[in-house]
Amino acid sequence: MRHYEIVFMVHPDQSEQVAGMIERYTGSITEAGGKIHRLEDWGRRQLAYPINKLHKAHYVLMNVEAGQEVIDELETAFRFNDAVLRNMIMRTKAAITEQSIMLKQKEERAERAPRREERAEAKPEAAAE
């Protein structure tokens, strides 16, 4: 079995169906004896350029170990699913399990947000004294 990195973008109006899509795709991989090494749901993100007059899409990243038959099945599923705007399947040399840069940045922003709120609350208190 080979290692693959799969990224697909879903229509923003179909965001609530992403969990079901992920479950369906991961189920087909594991049923065929494959493994999922990393699964990241990046959420809605701005597109670099409009696709079908859309400016945002829901991104999902998966790193899997699977056979070619499963990958062919996934490609067909992506092609015939109208909610999937774009997809990319790349073969990699080894399993990638650490967090992606996109997810690390998202977590860093989430950590900084409470700090900003604390600073904003501290400034009015200091001005009142």
Swiss-Prot record:
Binds together with bS18 to 16S ribosomal RNA. GO terms for biological process: translation. GO terms for molecular function: small ribosomal subunit rRNA binding; structural constituent of ribosome. Gene3D superfamilies: 3.30.70.60. It comes from Vibrio campbellii (strain ATCC BAA-1116). The gene is rpsF. Pfam families: Ribosomal_S6. One of its GO terms (cellular component) is cytosolic small ribosomal subunit. Residues 104-129 have a biased composition (Basic and acidic residues). InterPro entries: Ribosomal_bS6 (IPR000529), Ribosomal_bS6_CS (IPR020815), Ribosomal_bS6_sf (IPR035980), Ribosomal_S6_plastid/chlpt (IPR020814), Transl_elong_EF1B/ribsomal_bS6 (IPR014717). Belongs to the bacterial ribosomal protein bS6 family. Residues 103-129 are annotated as: Disordered. This is Small ribosomal subunit protein bS6. Keywords: Ribonucleoprotein, Ribosomal protein, RNA-binding, rRNA-binding. NCBIfam families: S6.
